[in-house]
Amino acid sequence: YGEGIPMEKLFHLKENNTTVRTEIVAGLTTFMTMAYIIALNPNLLTGFGAEGGSQLWNGVFLATCIASAVGTLVMAFAANKPFAMAPGMGLNSFFAVVVANIVSLTGMSYLQSFQTALCVILIEGIVFIILSVLKVREKIVEAIPLGIRLGIAPAIGLMLLNIGIGSNAGVYSSDGGPFYVMRDFFGALTPSLAKANMGDGYPQMVLTVVTMFVGLFLIVLFAHKKIKGSVLLGMLCASGIYWAGEAIFLHTNPFASLKGASFVPAFGDMAETTLFKFDFAALGEIGWFTVVTLVITFCIIDMFDTIGTLVGLSLIHISEPTRRRG
């Protein structure tokens, strides 16, 4: 249990019926499960690097890493809760839409509109903190039917599953039927059409789909066998299978992208593009009514994301005292 060492004193492992080993495995599993956000967030907010230049991409990338680390450490040491924190898919998607609309409506550069939208996020964050301190958020949670509260987290999970299977792995249901065929990221393709038109991309897509199903099967198998760290082991095995498949069947080096890669954090790019870069002067150009509307919208998205996550992770059930703690 880690008794006699700082881990036990800091996190009350015995009281929470856990061990240092369990926490390490859980931490690694959580990291690998959510690590996609490190690349997805800057890609989403910069149009895969097409908007704002590489400086903005680097700035968002580093900000994502730092914000996730700081948020998770605060949850660990201040709240003593096993929750990892990172940018949410709901908020960042809407943020990208807002930035794009500011560009089209005002003619600002993408970077300036990005920094203007950051002001909206800052205001929304302050409002959200005030609502939490005044326990308004708690009242809102209590007013939501328990069934809806418990359904938010699974709904988010199913959305991510759809994104992962349909967009990344390349699997979708043909005409609403029960059979699945492969597609690329941009649209539906039958296997024969894909093979004829995708060239070298087709074998890679097949390898991706096969690896995904093998990985899922291994996770279920390990869990059925009650092997600790089943999710982590399944992900590691699937990664190894994919890398081996790339080398054997695709005749490519799975680690080629590491050549020439820089491992020095781009603090300069973050300082230039995102660090305290709030363009309050430009808020007037989009109109204060629009600003208020955006703050309210962001606050609602943030609130329901938080409610769904906390309820789902806390396994809050029907008893009234437990519900009030939600």
Placement of each model-derived feature along the sequence:
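Single conserved hydrophobic/aromatic residue that forms the stacking wall/gate
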Residues: 317-326
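Flexible hinge motifs at transmembrane-helix junctions and intramembrane kinks/re-entrant loops
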Residues: 200-204, 217-271, 299-303, 307
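P-loop potassium selectivity filter motif centered on the GYG triad
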Residues: 183-201, 258-288, 295-301, 308
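Hydrophobic mid-bilayer segments of alpha-helices in multi-pass membrane transport proteins
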Residues: 89-91, 121-122, 152, 156, ...
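Select transmembrane alpha-helical segments in multipass membrane proteins
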Residues: 21-28, 118, 284-297
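Early transmembrane hairpin of solute transport permeases
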Residues: 25-207
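Hydrophobic, membrane-inserted alpha-helices
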Residues: 67-72, 213-219
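Short, Lys/Arg-rich, polar N-terminal cytosolic tail immediately upstream
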Residues: 4-17
